[in-house]
Protein backbone atom coordinates (compact mmCIF):
# COMPACT_ATOMS: atom_id res chain seq x y z
CA UNK A 1 0.00 0.00 0.00
CA UNK A 2 1.45 3.37 -1.04
CA UNK A 3 0.52 6.07 1.47
CA UNK A 4 1.68 8.75 -0.95
CA UNK A 5 -1.71 8.23 -2.59
CA UNK A 6 -3.24 10.13 0.31
CA UNK A 7 -0.94 13.12 -0.12
CA UNK A 8 -1.35 13.10 -3.90
CA UNK A 9 -5.13 12.96 -3.51
CA UNK A 10 -5.07 15.88 -1.07
CA UNK A 11 -2.89 17.99 -3.37
CA UNK A 12 -5.00 17.29 -6.44
CA UNK A 13 -8.23 18.15 -4.69
CA UNK A 14 -7.00 21.45 -3.27
CA UNK A 15 -7.38 23.02 -6.70
CA UNK A 16 -11.12 22.42 -6.76
CA UNK A 17 -11.98 23.43 -3.19
CA UNK A 18 -13.12 26.92 -4.16
CA UNK A 19 -15.33 25.85 -7.04
CA UNK A 20 -16.99 23.08 -5.06
CA UNK A 21 -17.62 25.10 -1.89
CA UNK A 22 -17.97 28.73 -2.80
CA UNK A 23 -19.88 29.60 0.34
CA UNK A 24 -17.81 27.57 2.82
CA UNK A 25 -14.60 28.59 4.52
CA UNK A 26 -12.50 25.43 4.42
CA UNK A 27 -9.20 25.15 6.24
CA UNK A 28 -6.64 23.72 3.83
CA UNK A 29 -4.48 20.78 4.93
CA UNK A 30 -1.22 21.74 6.62
CA UNK A 31 1.82 19.44 6.55
CA UNK A 32 4.26 19.50 9.47
CA UNK A 33 7.57 17.59 9.49
CA UNK A 34 7.97 15.62 12.73
CA UNK A 35 9.93 12.34 12.90
CA UNK A 36 9.59 9.01 11.08
CA UNK A 37 8.59 5.97 13.10
CA UNK A 38 11.69 4.04 12.00
CA UNK A 39 14.18 3.75 9.14
CA UNK A 40 12.56 5.40 6.11
CA UNK A 41 13.90 2.72 3.76
CA UNK A 42 12.68 -0.24 5.83
CA UNK A 43 10.70 -2.42 3.35
CA UNK A 44 9.19 -4.48 6.15
CA UNK A 45 7.46 -1.53 7.78
CA UNK A 46 4.06 -2.88 8.85
CA UNK A 47 2.53 0.36 10.11
CA UNK A 48 2.04 2.91 7.34
CA UNK A 49 0.84 5.57 9.76
CA UNK A 50 -2.31 6.55 11.60
CA UNK A 51 -5.43 8.65 11.26
CA UNK A 52 -6.46 10.93 14.10
CA UNK A 53 -10.09 12.01 14.47
CA UNK A 54 -10.50 15.41 16.11
CA UNK A 55 -13.89 15.59 17.81
CA UNK A 56 -14.52 19.32 17.51
CA UNK A 57 -16.65 21.08 20.11
CA UNK A 58 -20.35 20.19 20.06
CA UNK A 59 -22.29 22.49 17.76
CA UNK A 60 -19.21 23.76 15.93
CA UNK A 61 -19.33 21.24 13.05
CA UNK A 62 -15.54 20.96 13.28
CA UNK A 63 -14.79 17.24 13.34
CA UNK A 64 -11.63 16.78 11.26
CA UNK A 65 -9.19 14.06 10.22
CA UNK A 66 -5.40 14.24 10.47
CA UNK A 67 -2.85 11.75 9.13
CA UNK A 68 0.65 10.79 10.29
CA UNK A 69 2.92 9.21 7.66
CA UNK A 70 5.32 6.96 9.57
CA UNK A 71 7.83 6.60 6.73
CA UNK A 72 8.30 10.27 5.87
CA UNK A 73 7.69 11.54 9.39
CA UNK A 74 5.08 14.09 8.32
CA UNK A 75 1.86 15.04 10.08
CA UNK A 76 -0.95 16.42 7.90
CA UNK A 77 -3.89 18.23 9.47
CA UNK A 78 -7.42 18.33 8.09
CA UNK A 79 -7.19 15.96 5.12
CA UNK A 80 -10.86 15.03 4.72
CA UNK A 81 -12.09 18.21 3.06
CA UNK A 82 -9.37 18.18 0.43
CA UNK A 83 -9.87 14.49 -0.33
CA UNK A 84 -13.64 15.01 -0.60
CA UNK A 85 -14.25 18.55 -1.94
CA UNK A 86 -17.83 17.87 -3.03
CA UNK A 87 -19.02 16.75 0.42
CA UNK A 88 -21.02 19.50 2.11
CA UNK A 89 -20.04 20.46 5.66
CA UNK A 90 -17.10 18.06 5.62
CA UNK A 91 -17.15 15.41 8.38
CA UNK A 92 -19.75 16.99 10.64
CA UNK A 93 -20.35 17.57 14.34
CA UNK A 94 -18.47 15.66 17.10
CA UNK A 95 -16.25 12.82 15.92
CA UNK A 96 -16.72 10.18 18.59
CA UNK A 97 -15.00 7.02 17.32
CA UNK A 98 -12.63 5.90 14.58
CA UNK A 99 -11.63 2.49 13.22
CA UNK A 100 -10.03 0.79 10.24
CA UNK A 101 -11.61 -2.53 9.30
CA UNK A 102 -10.45 -4.29 6.17
CA UNK A 103 -9.70 -1.66 3.55
CA UNK A 104 -12.11 0.91 4.95
CA UNK A 105 -11.88 3.76 7.41
CA UNK A 106 -14.93 4.35 9.61
CA UNK A 107 -15.47 7.71 11.36
CA UNK A 108 -18.42 7.90 13.74
CA UNK A 109 -19.83 11.43 13.89
CA UNK A 110 -22.06 11.57 16.94
CA UNK A 111 -24.12 14.75 16.59
CA UNK A 112 -24.37 14.41 12.81
CA UNK A 113 -26.01 11.02 13.41
CA UNK A 114 -23.86 9.11 10.94
CA UNK A 115 -20.87 6.93 10.30
CA UNK A 116 -18.71 8.17 7.47
CA UNK A 117 -17.09 5.36 5.46
CA UNK A 118 -13.90 6.03 3.48
CA UNK A 119 -11.22 4.17 1.58
CA UNK A 120 -8.48 3.70 4.18
CA UNK A 121 -5.70 4.26 1.63
CA UNK A 122 -6.98 7.51 0.13
CA UNK A 123 -9.54 8.92 2.60
CA UNK A 124 -11.99 9.13 -0.31
CA UNK A 125 -15.62 8.92 0.82
CA UNK A 126 -17.48 5.70 -0.06
CA UNK A 127 -20.77 6.28 1.74
CA UNK A 128 -22.41 6.72 5.12
CA UNK A 129 -24.69 4.93 7.55
CA UNK A 130 -27.31 7.01 9.36
CA UNK A 131 -27.73 6.12 13.04
CA UNK A 132 -29.20 8.62 15.53
CA UNK A 133 -26.93 9.79 18.35
CA UNK A 134 -24.40 7.07 17.57
CA UNK A 135 -21.58 6.56 20.04
CA UNK A 136 -19.05 3.73 19.55
CA UNK A 137 -18.26 0.89 17.14
CA UNK A 138 -17.11 -2.74 17.13
CA UNK A 139 -16.64 -5.22 14.27
CA UNK A 140 -17.16 -8.95 13.86
CA UNK A 141 -17.10 -10.82 10.55
CA UNK A 142 -18.99 -8.89 7.86
CA UNK A 143 -20.82 -6.70 10.35
CA UNK A 144 -20.31 -3.41 12.14
CA UNK A 145 -22.01 -2.96 15.52
CA UNK A 146 -22.83 0.55 16.74
CA UNK A 147 -24.18 1.81 20.05
CA UNK A 148 -26.89 4.46 19.80
CA UNK A 149 -28.54 6.64 22.42
CA UNK A 150 -31.51 6.56 20.01
CA UNK A 151 -33.02 9.76 21.38
CA UNK A 152 -32.11 13.46 21.30
CA UNK A 153 -29.37 15.18 23.32
CA UNK A 154 -31.42 16.13 26.39
CA UNK A 155 -30.40 16.03 30.06
CA UNK A 156 -33.42 14.59 31.87
CA UNK A 157 -33.47 12.39 35.02
CA UNK A 158 -36.68 10.86 33.65
CA UNK A 159 -35.36 10.17 30.15
CA UNK A 160 -37.62 7.51 28.60
CA UNK A 161 -35.79 6.44 25.42
CA UNK A 162 -33.77 3.25 25.77
CA UNK A 163 -30.71 2.92 23.58
CA UNK A 164 -29.88 0.19 21.11
CA UNK A 165 -27.12 -1.55 19.20
CA UNK A 166 -27.37 -1.40 15.41
CA UNK A 167 -26.07 -4.21 13.20
CA UNK A 168 -24.67 -2.86 9.94
CA UNK A 169 -23.80 -4.93 6.86
CA UNK A 170 -20.38 -3.60 5.84
CA UNK A 171 -20.93 -4.66 2.22
CA UNK A 172 -24.22 -2.80 1.69
CA UNK A 173 -23.62 -0.10 4.35
CA UNK A 174 -27.16 -0.65 5.62
CA UNK A 175 -28.59 -1.28 9.08
CA UNK A 176 -30.00 -4.82 9.01
CA UNK A 177 -31.11 -5.18 12.65
CA UNK A 178 -31.23 -3.48 16.03
CA UNK A 179 -31.47 -4.74 19.60
CA UNK A 180 -32.58 -2.64 22.58
CA UNK A 181 -30.17 -2.34 25.52
CA UNK A 182 -30.05 0.10 28.46
CA UNK A 183 -30.10 3.89 28.66
CA UNK A 184 -27.40 5.79 26.74
CA UNK A 185 -25.14 2.87 25.75
CA UNK A 186 -21.53 3.89 25.18
CA UNK A 187 -18.58 1.50 24.85
CA UNK A 188 -18.89 -1.80 22.99
CA UNK A 189 -16.50 -4.74 22.62
CA UNK A 190 -16.49 -8.17 20.98
CA UNK A 191 -15.26 -11.32 22.71
CA UNK A 192 -16.00 -14.73 21.25
CA UNK A 193 -19.55 -14.79 19.98
CA UNK A 194 -20.81 -12.00 22.21
CA UNK A 195 -20.99 -8.22 22.37
CA UNK A 196 -20.47 -6.38 25.64
CA UNK A 197 -22.18 -2.99 25.90
CA UNK A 198 -21.72 -0.39 28.65
CA UNK A 199 -24.94 1.44 29.53
CA UNK A 200 -24.20 4.89 30.98
CA UNK A 201 -27.48 6.65 31.68
CA UNK A 202 -25.40 9.75 31.01
CA UNK A 203 -28.41 11.94 30.26
CA UNK A 204 -30.18 10.89 33.46
CA UNK A 205 -28.02 12.33 36.26
CA UNK A 206 -28.25 11.61 39.12
CA UNK A 207 -30.07 8.41 38.08
CA UNK A 208 -27.21 6.87 36.12
CA UNK A 209 -27.23 3.36 34.69
CA UNK A 210 -25.10 0.58 36.24
CA UNK A 211 -25.41 -2.27 33.79
CA UNK A 212 -23.55 -3.98 30.97
CA UNK A 213 -25.70 -5.67 28.32
CA UNK A 214 -24.42 -8.95 26.89
CA UNK A 215 -25.60 -9.71 23.35
CA UNK A 216 -25.39 -13.08 21.62
CA UNK A 217 -24.05 -12.28 18.14
CA UNK A 218 -25.59 -15.14 16.10
CA UNK A 219 -29.03 -14.65 17.65
CA UNK A 220 -28.56 -10.89 18.07
CA UNK A 221 -30.45 -10.64 21.33
CA UNK A 222 -29.58 -9.65 24.89
CA UNK A 223 -28.79 -12.79 26.88
CA UNK A 224 -27.54 -11.20 30.10
CA UNK A 225 -27.55 -7.89 31.96
CA UNK A 226 -24.72 -7.49 34.46
CA UNK A 227 -24.54 -4.96 37.29
CA UNK A 228 -21.08 -3.35 37.05
CA UNK A 229 -20.90 0.21 38.34
CA UNK A 230 -22.18 3.74 38.02
CA UNK A 231 -22.21 5.64 34.72
CA UNK A 232 -20.29 3.18 32.54
CA UNK A 233 -18.20 4.39 29.62
CA UNK A 234 -15.47 2.63 27.67
CA UNK A 235 -15.17 -1.14 27.26
CA UNK A 236 -12.39 -3.36 25.94
CA UNK A 237 -11.86 -7.11 25.65
CA UNK A 238 -8.45 -8.60 26.42
CA UNK A 239 -6.94 -11.93 25.34
CA UNK A 240 -7.54 -13.57 28.72
CA UNK A 241 -11.31 -13.93 28.54
CA UNK A 242 -11.93 -10.68 30.41
CA UNK A 243 -13.88 -7.49 29.77
CA UNK A 244 -12.57 -4.20 31.17
CA UNK A 245 -15.26 -1.62 31.87
CA UNK A 246 -14.70 1.98 32.94
CA UNK A 247 -17.10 3.66 35.37
CA UNK A 248 -17.18 7.46 35.53
CA UNK A 249 -18.90 7.72 38.91
CA UNK A 250 -21.28 10.58 39.68
CA UNK A 251 -18.80 13.52 39.92
CA UNK A 252 -19.71 13.94 43.60
CA UNK A 253 -19.26 11.18 46.18
CA UNK A 254 -18.72 8.19 43.86
CA UNK A 255 -15.39 8.26 42.09
CA UNK A 256 -14.36 6.64 38.82
CA UNK A 257 -13.35 2.97 38.73
CA UNK A 258 -12.05 0.38 36.31
CA UNK A 259 -13.67 -3.04 36.58
CA UNK A 260 -12.52 -6.39 35.22
CA UNK A 261 -15.30 -8.85 34.38
CA UNK A 262 -14.39 -12.52 33.97
CA UNK A 263 -16.49 -13.96 31.14
CA UNK A 264 -16.30 -17.60 32.24
CA UNK A 265 -16.93 -16.91 35.94
CA UNK A 266 -19.57 -14.26 35.07
CA UNK A 267 -18.36 -11.99 37.87
CA UNK A 268 -16.23 -8.94 38.59
CA UNK A 269 -12.74 -10.11 39.52
CA UNK A 270 -10.99 -6.75 39.88
CA UNK A 271 -12.07 -3.28 41.00
CA UNK A 272 -9.41 -0.62 40.50
CA UNK A 273 -9.58 3.01 41.64
CA UNK A 274 -8.54 4.45 38.28
CA UNK A 275 -10.03 7.31 36.27
CA UNK A 276 -10.38 6.37 32.59
CA UNK A 277 -10.77 9.10 30.01
CA UNK A 278 -9.35 6.81 27.35
CA UNK A 279 -7.64 3.42 27.34
CA UNK A 280 -5.73 1.33 24.82
CA UNK A 281 -4.84 -2.35 25.02
CA UNK A 282 -1.38 -3.34 23.73
CA UNK A 283 -0.47 -7.00 24.27
CA UNK A 284 -1.19 -7.54 27.98
CA UNK A 285 -1.01 -3.91 29.06
CA UNK A 286 -3.75 -1.27 29.20
CA UNK A 287 -2.48 2.30 28.80
CA UNK A 288 -4.80 4.82 30.46
CA UNK A 289 -5.18 8.59 30.56
CA UNK A 290 -7.65 10.16 32.97
CA UNK A 291 -9.35 13.47 33.63
CA UNK A 292 -11.39 13.29 36.82
CA UNK A 293 -13.69 16.28 37.30
CA UNK A 294 -15.23 16.89 40.73
CA UNK A 295 -18.41 18.91 41.18
CA UNK A 296 -17.44 19.22 44.85
CA UNK A 297 -14.02 20.83 44.44
CA UNK A 298 -14.75 22.16 40.93
CA UNK A 299 -11.31 20.92 39.91
CA UNK A 300 -9.94 18.51 37.33
CA UNK A 301 -7.40 15.83 38.28
CA UNK A 302 -5.14 14.46 35.55
CA UNK A 303 -3.79 10.93 35.84
CA UNK A 304 -1.97 8.22 33.92
CA UNK A 305 -1.79 4.48 34.54
CA UNK A 306 -0.71 1.14 33.12
CA UNK A 307 -2.65 -2.01 34.05
CA UNK A 308 -1.48 -5.60 33.50
CA UNK A 309 -4.49 -7.67 32.38
CA UNK A 310 -3.01 -10.94 33.65
CA UNK A 311 -2.29 -9.79 37.19
CA UNK A 312 -5.30 -7.41 37.05
CA UNK A 313 -3.23 -4.81 38.83
CA UNK A 314 -1.96 -1.32 38.14
CA UNK A 315 1.75 -1.71 37.42
CA UNK A 316 2.62 1.94 36.87
CA UNK A 317 1.26 5.36 37.75
CA UNK A 318 2.52 6.72 34.43
CA UNK A 319 4.11 5.65 31.16
CA UNK A 320 5.80 9.06 30.71
CA UNK A 321 9.25 9.09 32.30
CA UNK A 322 10.86 12.41 31.36
CA UNK A 323 8.56 14.82 33.18
CA UNK A 324 6.97 16.22 30.02
CA UNK A 325 3.49 15.20 31.14
CA UNK A 326 3.41 18.63 32.81
CA UNK A 327 3.10 20.14 29.32
CA UNK A 328 -0.15 18.25 28.68
CA UNK A 329 -3.17 20.18 29.95
CA UNK A 330 -5.97 17.69 29.29
CA UNK A 331 -4.81 14.20 28.24
CA UNK A 332 -7.72 13.10 26.10
CA UNK A 333 -6.70 10.13 23.96
CA UNK A 334 -4.04 7.42 24.04
CA UNK A 335 -2.80 4.86 21.52
CA UNK A 336 0.18 2.53 21.10
CA UNK A 337 1.81 1.67 17.77
CA UNK A 338 1.50 -2.14 17.49
CA UNK A 339 5.01 -2.49 15.99
CA UNK A 340 7.28 0.33 17.19
CA UNK A 341 5.45 0.54 20.54
CA UNK A 342 5.60 4.32 20.39
CA UNK A 343 2.94 5.81 22.68
CA UNK A 344 0.71 8.65 21.52
CA UNK A 345 -1.13 11.00 23.89
CA UNK A 346 -3.49 13.72 22.69
CA UNK A 347 -4.09 16.96 24.56
CA UNK A 348 -7.57 18.51 24.35
CA UNK A 349 -6.26 21.71 25.98
CA UNK A 350 -9.28 24.03 26.45
CA UNK A 351 -11.62 21.98 24.19
CA UNK A 352 -12.15 25.01 21.93
CA UNK A 353 -8.85 25.73 20.19
CA UNK A 354 -6.59 23.24 18.38
CA UNK A 355 -5.00 20.61 20.59
CA UNK A 356 -1.70 18.73 20.36
CA UNK A 357 -0.44 15.20 19.94
CA UNK A 358 2.64 13.91 21.79
CA UNK A 359 4.70 10.93 20.61
CA UNK A 360 6.65 9.02 23.26
CA UNK A 361 9.19 6.26 22.76
CA UNK A 362 8.48 2.92 24.50
CA UNK A 363 10.70 4.04 27.39
CA UNK A 364 8.45 7.05 27.99
CA UNK A 365 10.62 9.86 26.63
CA UNK A 366 9.20 12.51 24.32
CA UNK A 367 10.06 12.09 20.62
CA UNK A 368 7.94 14.82 19.03
CA UNK A 369 4.81 16.90 19.37
CA UNK A 370 2.68 18.87 16.91
CA UNK A 371 -0.64 20.75 16.81
CA UNK A 372 -3.83 18.93 15.78
CA UNK A 373 -7.44 19.90 15.20
CA UNK A 374 -9.91 20.74 17.98
CA UNK A 375 -10.17 18.07 20.70
CA UNK A 376 -7.90 15.36 19.24
CA UNK A 377 -9.26 12.07 20.40
CA UNK A 378 -9.34 8.84 18.40
CA UNK A 379 -6.51 7.07 16.57
CA UNK A 380 -6.63 4.24 14.02
CA UNK A 381 -3.40 2.70 12.71
CA UNK A 382 -3.11 1.99 9.00
CA UNK A 383 -1.27 -1.27 8.32
CA UNK A 384 0.44 -2.30 5.11
Task: Name these PLM-found stretches.
Residues 1-8:
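Bacterial N-terminal signal peptides that target proteins for export
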Residues 5, 21-384:
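Predominantly soluble domains enriched in secretory-pathway, periplasmic, or organellar proteins
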Residues 16-19:
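C-terminal motif of bacterial Sec signal peptides marking the signal peptidase cleavage site
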